[in-house]
Structures are given as C-alpha cells and as structure tokens.
Amino acid sequence: CYSNGRCYGAPASRKERKLTMIEKVNPSHPDKVADRIAGAIVDLAYKTEAAPKIAVEVLIGHGKCHVIIETTAAINPLDVEDAIHRIAGAVWADIDIVPQDKHLSDNQSAGIRCGDNGIFKGMPLTEEQKALSVIAHDIYTHYPYDGKYIIDEARLIICQSNASTAELSNMYPPAEVNPLGDWTGGTDVDTGATNRKLGSDMADSVTGGGLHGKDLSKADVTLNIYAFLKAQETGKQVQIACAIGDDIIDGHPYQELVDIAAEYISSVGGFEKFAEWGLF
C-alpha cells in the first residue's frame, strides 16, 4: 500500500495463490494512439449510417500515419485526416478508403449476423488488475504522455515518459520507476499499430481478436464485450465460439448482443473513448 491509501497486491508465494501478472498502457502509448485513431474513424462511420460495416487498420510513427479503411459508409477523407491530426498531431496522413467486399455485405443484407468466426473468453478481473488500472489512470492525470505499467505479484513497475523519476518514486514509493532513467516516448520514438495491446485492453480475457477499428457486427467487438461483461456479472469464466453468419450466440439473438455492446460503447463515450483504455 502507498501513502495515498492505494494498494496493488500483497506478497505471496506462487504456491499460495495463482500467479497474477498484468500490463496496462495509457492512451498516449503509440499502439493506443493507433487504436484511438481507428476508433475515431469508426465513430465517423456511425455518424453516416445506423449500422455501418467497417474495418480500420492504422500504422503510425515518425511523422507518418497510414490508414486503410474498408467500409460501407461514405466517410469523407478530410474528416479522417482531421481525426488523425487531432489525436496524433501534425503527421503526414496516408488514407486509403475501399468498399467492403460484396460477399461480406451480402452476408449482412438480411439483418445483423455474426460477422466472423472466432473464440472468445470473459474472465472476472482480479484485484491486482483493477488496482493497476486505477494506478495507470492516476499517473496519466499527472503525466498525459506515453507510459506502461506492470504488476507481477507484489512487484510494481512504472515506465512513464516525460516525467520525473524522483517525483513518481515519491508517489509510489515501493515501485520500480523508469529502471533505465528518465525517457521520452510517443510516436516519434516508437511506432504504433491497431490492436497490439490486447492484454492491456482485456486482461485475462484475451483470445483471438482485438477490439478496435471495427463495427459491432464484428464478433471481435461485440462478443468480447459481452463475454467480459458477463464474466464480471457472474464472477465466472465465460467461453463462446461462433461461426460467421451465426444469428444465435450463447442462447441469444446476435442482434441482442450487438445492442448490449452498443450500450456499453455509448456509456464510455464512443469507439474512440473505448480505445483509450479498453475494457478496464
């Protein structure tokens, strides 16, 4: 526990309890910058259509941002460029917008059905995972720059760019802070790509697909959200598998699960906001 009253875990042998490790990155990590841009573009699609189909890939780094968008929605490239600059600053934007594959479009023409094959798992969050999220949010309010944080049982590691190691050590005295010293980060130091921080987004619920840059017909979004929420509610592991085109999943119409996911996305402020921290 720290002087501010927050605790992240207690020492225990590996035999006494299940090994707990968790990583969390903040919204300014290059991979999360890519996720946020992808989320902002999905938000644009939902402004033009009630149920758009869209898949976005973003690669960003060293002054350049490459974006590929496959969609049914009529998205203005200038709006995409504005979103890139708002999130990532004055980078050169390479934007490619292509129509969705006709066969995939036909699959959804009679109504929303599962948009992909996949396996999904929801796991209840551990106390350490919840605590690390609190720590990450707390540090980010003081230092809104690229950072990564890890808990390995009783070990807390804080790597925070553009921050005083001494100040962070005072905030979290037992932590290992910036082991190699003060540093700068961001997309001029590292590159970022969509859906590379699955553990940070989903904790132990990681299976196959990522959460970002996709509409709600995509099982990677809707079923990951549904499985995660169900696991938190029941306190038990949730496992789901689906085939593309399925209209009943876990005993529910797929549209019902889409509605649950849509409500969750709305509650956090949209796809861009969802991309900042993921599911926890």
Predicted ranges, named:
Residues C1-T20:
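Short, Lys/Arg-enriched N-terminal segments with co-localized hydrophobic residues
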